[in-house]
Protein backbone atom coordinates (compact mmCIF):
# COMPACT_ATOMS: atom_id res chain seq x y z
CA UNK A 1 0.00 0.00 0.00
CA UNK A 2 0.85 3.65 0.10
CA UNK A 3 -0.15 6.98 1.57
CA UNK A 4 -2.61 9.13 -0.31
CA UNK A 5 -1.58 12.75 -0.07
CA UNK A 6 -3.36 15.51 -1.97
CA UNK A 7 -2.43 15.21 -5.61
CA UNK A 8 -2.94 18.94 -6.09
CA UNK A 9 -2.92 21.92 -3.76
CA UNK A 10 -5.81 23.46 -5.70
CA UNK A 11 -8.80 21.37 -4.69
CA UNK A 12 -10.88 22.30 -7.74
CA UNK A 13 -8.27 20.65 -10.00
CA UNK A 14 -8.93 17.26 -8.43
CA UNK A 15 -11.43 15.52 -10.66
CA UNK A 16 -12.96 12.05 -10.50
CA UNK A 17 -10.85 11.18 -13.55
CA UNK A 18 -7.62 12.10 -11.72
CA UNK A 19 -8.72 10.09 -8.70
CA UNK A 20 -9.55 7.06 -10.88
CA UNK A 21 -6.20 7.32 -12.68
CA UNK A 22 -4.29 7.43 -9.40
CA UNK A 23 -6.22 4.53 -7.88
CA UNK A 24 -6.02 2.51 -11.12
CA UNK A 25 -2.24 2.78 -10.75
CA UNK A 26 -2.45 1.54 -7.15
CA UNK A 27 -4.51 -1.46 -8.25
CA UNK A 28 -2.09 -2.17 -11.13
CA UNK A 29 0.76 -2.16 -8.60
CA UNK A 30 -1.14 -4.77 -6.54
CA UNK A 31 -1.68 -2.47 -3.57
CA UNK A 32 -4.36 -3.62 -1.19
CA UNK A 33 -4.39 -0.61 1.16
CA UNK A 34 -4.41 3.16 0.77
CA UNK A 35 -3.76 5.35 3.81
CA UNK A 36 -5.40 8.77 3.78
CA UNK A 37 -2.61 10.88 5.28
CA UNK A 38 -3.62 13.11 8.19
CA UNK A 39 -1.85 16.16 6.77
CA UNK A 40 -4.18 16.39 3.79
CA UNK A 41 -7.96 16.38 3.58
CA UNK A 42 -10.84 13.92 3.45
CA UNK A 43 -11.23 12.81 -0.19
CA UNK A 44 -14.49 13.05 -2.11
CA UNK A 45 -16.98 10.19 -2.03
CA UNK A 46 -15.84 8.97 -5.47
CA UNK A 47 -12.50 8.03 -3.89
CA UNK A 48 -14.16 5.70 -1.38
CA UNK A 49 -16.63 4.38 -3.97
CA UNK A 50 -13.70 3.37 -6.18
CA UNK A 51 -11.95 1.67 -3.26
CA UNK A 52 -15.17 -0.21 -2.43
CA UNK A 53 -15.50 -1.41 -6.02
CA UNK A 54 -11.84 -2.39 -6.46
CA UNK A 55 -11.04 -4.03 -3.14
CA UNK A 56 -8.73 -1.38 -1.70
CA UNK A 57 -8.75 -1.10 2.09
CA UNK A 58 -8.72 2.49 3.38
CA UNK A 59 -6.66 3.46 6.43
CA UNK A 60 -8.37 6.75 7.28
CA UNK A 61 -6.45 9.33 9.31
CA UNK A 62 -8.31 12.18 10.91
CA UNK A 63 -6.84 15.47 9.72
CA UNK A 64 -4.36 16.17 12.51
CA UNK A 65 -0.68 15.97 11.66
CA UNK A 66 2.83 16.96 12.62
CA UNK A 67 1.82 19.43 15.31
CA UNK A 68 0.81 19.71 18.95
CA UNK A 69 -2.51 21.32 19.77
CA UNK A 70 -3.66 23.15 22.87
CA UNK A 71 -7.10 21.76 23.67
CA UNK A 72 -9.42 24.76 23.96
CA UNK A 73 -13.18 24.43 24.31
CA UNK A 74 -13.61 25.57 20.70
CA UNK A 75 -11.14 22.93 19.47
CA UNK A 76 -12.86 20.28 21.61
CA UNK A 77 -16.20 21.06 19.95
CA UNK A 78 -14.58 21.07 16.50
CA UNK A 79 -12.91 17.68 17.08
CA UNK A 80 -16.20 16.09 18.11
CA UNK A 81 -18.07 17.63 15.17
CA UNK A 82 -15.38 16.67 12.63
CA UNK A 83 -15.23 13.12 13.95
CA UNK A 84 -18.98 12.60 13.85
CA UNK A 85 -19.42 14.25 10.45
CA UNK A 86 -16.75 12.19 8.74
CA UNK A 87 -17.57 8.92 10.49
CA UNK A 88 -21.22 9.39 9.56
CA UNK A 89 -20.27 10.07 5.94
CA UNK A 90 -17.78 7.22 5.54
CA UNK A 91 -18.93 4.39 7.84
CA UNK A 92 -20.98 2.61 5.17
CA UNK A 93 -18.00 2.07 2.87
CA UNK A 94 -16.85 -1.54 2.70
CA UNK A 95 -13.33 -0.28 2.04
CA UNK A 96 -13.03 1.50 5.40
CA UNK A 97 -10.64 -0.67 7.40
CA UNK A 98 -9.23 1.60 10.10
CA UNK A 99 -9.63 5.03 11.68
CA UNK A 100 -6.42 6.66 12.86
CA UNK A 101 -6.39 9.72 15.11
CA UNK A 102 -3.40 11.54 13.64
CA UNK A 103 -0.12 11.48 11.78
CA UNK A 104 3.12 11.46 13.82
CA UNK A 105 1.87 13.59 16.69
CA UNK A 106 2.61 11.05 19.41
CA UNK A 107 6.15 10.55 18.20
CA UNK A 108 6.65 14.34 18.17
CA UNK A 109 7.07 14.30 21.94
CA UNK A 110 10.30 12.37 21.81
CA UNK A 111 11.81 13.46 18.53
CA UNK A 112 10.89 17.03 17.65
CA UNK A 113 11.40 18.88 20.93
CA UNK A 114 10.31 22.41 21.77
CA UNK A 115 7.44 21.48 24.10
CA UNK A 116 9.23 21.90 27.43
CA UNK A 117 7.42 25.06 28.57
CA UNK A 118 4.00 23.43 28.45
CA UNK A 119 4.77 19.76 27.94
CA UNK A 120 2.66 18.35 30.79
CA UNK A 121 -0.41 20.33 29.76
CA UNK A 122 0.04 19.65 26.05
CA UNK A 123 0.68 15.95 26.64
CA UNK A 124 -2.55 15.70 28.65
CA UNK A 125 -4.37 17.61 25.89
CA UNK A 126 -2.98 15.13 23.35
CA UNK A 127 -4.14 12.15 25.40
CA UNK A 128 -7.57 13.70 25.88
CA UNK A 129 -7.98 14.37 22.16
CA UNK A 130 -6.76 11.07 20.76
CA UNK A 131 -7.37 8.58 23.57
CA UNK A 132 -10.75 9.96 24.71
CA UNK A 133 -12.55 12.57 22.57
CA UNK A 134 -12.14 11.03 19.13
CA UNK A 135 -12.79 7.41 20.18
CA UNK A 136 -15.90 8.43 22.14
CA UNK A 137 -17.28 10.58 19.30
CA UNK A 138 -16.44 7.84 16.82
CA UNK A 139 -18.40 5.22 18.77
CA UNK A 140 -21.60 7.23 18.34
CA UNK A 141 -21.27 7.04 14.54
CA UNK A 142 -19.15 3.95 13.85
CA UNK A 143 -18.69 1.47 16.67
CA UNK A 144 -17.49 -1.27 14.31
CA UNK A 145 -14.35 0.03 12.59
CA UNK A 146 -11.07 -0.25 14.52
CA UNK A 147 -9.52 2.95 15.89
CA UNK A 148 -5.77 3.53 16.38
CA UNK A 149 -4.69 6.81 18.06
CA UNK A 150 -1.65 7.78 15.95
CA UNK A 151 0.72 6.59 13.28
CA UNK A 152 3.03 5.59 14.84
CA UNK A 153 1.56 5.00 18.28
CA UNK A 154 2.26 3.27 21.54
CA UNK A 155 -1.27 3.84 22.77
CA UNK A 156 -0.26 6.95 24.70
CA UNK A 157 2.63 5.22 26.47
CA UNK A 158 5.33 7.57 25.21
CA UNK A 159 8.90 6.23 24.88
CA UNK A 160 7.94 2.56 25.21
CA UNK A 161 9.93 0.84 22.42
CA UNK A 162 8.03 -2.41 22.93
CA UNK A 163 4.52 -1.11 22.38
CA UNK A 164 4.34 0.99 19.22
CA UNK A 165 4.07 0.59 15.53
CA UNK A 166 7.46 2.06 14.73
CA UNK A 167 8.87 4.27 12.05
CA UNK A 168 12.63 4.37 11.57
CA UNK A 169 13.36 7.28 13.89
CA UNK A 170 11.33 6.06 16.88
CA UNK A 171 13.97 3.64 18.13
CA UNK A 172 17.15 5.58 17.42
CA UNK A 173 17.46 7.11 20.90
Task: Pin down the residues of each PLM region.
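Active-site neighborhood of glycoside hydrolase catalytic domains
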Residues: 72, 76-85, 89-153
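Short acidic, gly/pro-rich beta-turn/loop elements at beta-sheet edges
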Residues: 12, 109, 157
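Conserved small/polar residues in nucleotide/adenosyl-binding loops
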Residues: 170-173
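Solvent-exposed loop/turn segments at secondary-structure junctions
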Residues: 40-42, 64-66, 103-107, 154-155
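Short Asp/Glu-rich motifs
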Residues: 45-47, 69-71, 157-159
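Active-site-adjacent substrate/metal-binding segments within catalytic domains
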Residues: 1-67, 76-98
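Active-site loops of AMP-binding adenylate-forming
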Residues: 163
Amino acid sequence: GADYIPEDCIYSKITPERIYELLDTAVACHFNCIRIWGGGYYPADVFYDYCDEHGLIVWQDFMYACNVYELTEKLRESIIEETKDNAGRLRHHASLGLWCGNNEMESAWDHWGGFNDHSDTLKQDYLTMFEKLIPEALKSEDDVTFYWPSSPSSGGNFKDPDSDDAVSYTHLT
